[in-house]
Amino acid sequence: MITLLLAAAAAQPATTDPLAPLPQPQVTAPQLQTPKPQSDKPRMAPTQAPAIVAAPATTVPTSWREVFDGIRAGNWASAQAGIAALPQDLITPVAKAELYTAKGSPTVDLQSLQSLIAQAPELPDADQLARMAVTRGATTTPLIIPEKPTVGLGSAPSRYRARPVSGEPLADALRTQLDGYVKADDAANAEAAFLVQAPYLSADARAEAAQRVAWIYYVLGQDFEARRVADYWRTGASGEWGSQASWIAGLASWRLGDCNSAAREFRDVAANGTQRELIAAGYYWAARAEQACRRPQAVQGLLKAAASSAESFYGLLARETLGTETRLPPAPTVSTAAVDALPNVRRAVELAKIGENALAEEMLRHQAKIGSPADQPALLEIAKRLNLAGAQYWLATNGQPGVRIAAAERYPSPSWAPVRGWRVKPDLAFAHIIQESNFRSTAVSPAGAVGLMQVRPGSASDEANAAGMSFSPSSLYDPSYNLEYGQSFIERMRRSAYTGDQLPKVIASYNAGPLPVGRWSTIPDKGDPLLWIESVPYWETRYYVPAVMRNLWVYEGLGNEPQPSLKLLAQHRWPGFPAVR
């Protein structure tokens, strides 16, 4: 770092360009004077001249990384000096844009804004810079390269909470009333409240409320009551809530040993569901029910229907049962020649070299929005090459209409490692990361969980202390530290007496914590891990466990590794924690 002393900066005229070189202090040569003769009068005490206080030193960055650090720290003068001093290159417009748009940064004049936009109209911040120019007096909006609309390109099947029925005030009021009963596991009062309003609700609203009441009975182990409520009130419902009620009725029938009713209800789930993962689950469990009823002729067709969802939890279980391929096709090799020379791609490469990964990812995402749809596979290949897993995941799941990306690209496998090395299988950590953050290293949840594995600062501090490591909250944004704390928490959950080294319970503990998993040891699952998963009271954890396990199996398949937990679950046996290879 170079230090400039701006002792006389206050005496210089203000510059309008925030990036102009900082003024240098002026030195005035002393004037020679003829000494005056001394007087015989008593001498007065000399008046002391005011002390000259030097202006604070400004540190001039010697690298672009230091410039970006200065901007984030609010050291505006330092950042300005660095931008002015460093050689002008591809990163210069990025640094200027970051400075100009940073909250609290010095007001930039119109000429500087217009100059930057003209130089780099393809920047991600170009639109914001153009709007700033208008507020500074631009008579016309500066020309930029606009973003084009993007759409979702598809994702792995997943379970999610069904949308509440809308447009019925009575249903809204009942939903709020039932919330308290669900939390208290108070099935009797929940059903009583529902029956008061049932005559005034639509068929779908009745099915929604009945499903919630039935679920309380199911969690309490009162399977007859759960099936009674779900079966009766799903009549006449269409689509999502009818299939949700059928699902609970099917699970209750299965636990009651009624394979005929279970087969019928699970078939209804598959026929009327709208969620791909739930449809596959309906087919798979219907096959189990038919097998339990000794009707093997019906089993294979149902398993094949489930297996058609090749990237789903139950689809992969069905494929393993049928003995068909459980591995996704690998992603094709793509040439990047068409995009290598694009300014934003070149900037991404340079930014990644200096560790500015978030900015590098932003360059690639923005290029996908302003460029040709045909370029997206090459942009994704660049992201993989640069280890920008967050950009890879985004480019695999978002793009302009018409973009086609292989499903395998939705499973980034960056060459990252925890600071103390891998102690859990990397595939398992990455399987969690997809569900936790979609590989966004800067992600922060409303609850304060941070980074790739959504680690809470308090938990990370505990893990760091246990390992004899120093801890800084900012380290959670660093993949190597975030992975370290995440895998340490997985290890702790594995050692917990509540999980018994059983993989589904370890995964559940990562999401819900060990104490709830300990309470769930009383779930009447008949030793069946799939039934245990589907009976977990927390909906988020109930959907989280299959998603992480599916991700793990896909990673193992793409790496041509064995899939031991898939094989064991297909045999309805509890899988243990995977070993590190």
Please report, for each region that a protein language model flagged, where it lies by residue.
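Compositionally biased, proline/threonine/alanine/serine-rich low-complexity intrinsically disordered stretches
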Residues: A7-T62, T139-A171, G180-K183, W574-V580
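N-terminal, post-signal-peptide region of Sec/Tat-exported proteins
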Residues: L32-A51, T62-R65, R72-V108
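Solenoid-like repeat scaffolds
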Residues: A49-A57, Q80-L90, T101-G104, S115-L123, ...
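Alpha-helical segment of the N-proximal tetratricopeptide repeat
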Residues: P61-S78, P164-A192, V213-I216, L220, ...
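Catalytic glycan-binding domains that act on GlcNAc-containing polysaccharides
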Residues: A97-L99, L110-Q119, L123, M132, ...
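Extracellular/periplasmic ectodomains of large secreted or surface enzymes and adhesion receptors
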Residues: A307, E311, L316, E320-L351, ...
